[in-house]
């Protein structure tokens, strides 16, 4: 598992919720 990919995934999820 790539931690960097995981961080990007979490960031995108968070950004999505913030934009909603």
Curated annotation (Swiss-Prot):
GO terms for cellular component: extracellular region. It is found in: Secreted. Its main location: secreted. Keywords: Amidation, Secreted, Toxin. It comes from the Eukaryota. GO terms for molecular function: toxin activity. Expressed by the venom gland. Signal peptide: none annotated. The modification Serine amide is found at residue 20. Belongs to the cationic peptide 04 (cupiennin) family. 09 subfamily. This is Short cationic peptide-6a. It comes from Cupiennius salei (American wandering spider). The lineage of its organism: Eukaryota, Metazoa, Ecdysozoa, Arthropoda, Chelicerata.
């Amino acid at each position: 598992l790539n931690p960097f990919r995981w961080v990007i995934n979490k960031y995108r999820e968070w950004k999505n919720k913030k934009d909603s």
